[in-house]
Amino acid sequence: MCTATTYRSQDFYFGRTFDYEFNYGEEVTVTPRNYPFPLRHQNALTEHYAMIGIAHMAGDYPLYYDAVNEKGLGMAGLNFPGNAVYSKVQTGKDNIAQFEFIPWILGQCANVQEARVL
């Protein structure tokens, strides 16, 4: 289970626990602009914003738990066991795997409005 909290004032603050019983080898990870992110069902994401967050490195691929991009947009992939639903690949849709979602959004969007459109 993960716990996240936000505090809204003139600024916006986000915090998150990483309360797992064991370690996944996560580490602070910086992905520079335009580092290639191969995607399973789309062309690789090769032009994108830089980001920093907590990730497990699977080879050269950062599996982000949470991150923020250079524009200040951040997101977290919280764990809710038993509640995830995964659809089959659909022609004509953006088919983004769960582990690709954080870099896919943060790489292309500067703010929440852009993420909603995407």
Annotate each predicted stretch with a short phrase.
Residues M1-K93:
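A contiguous strand-loop segment
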Residues T91-L118:
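Alpha/propeptide regions of enzymes that mature by internal proteolysis
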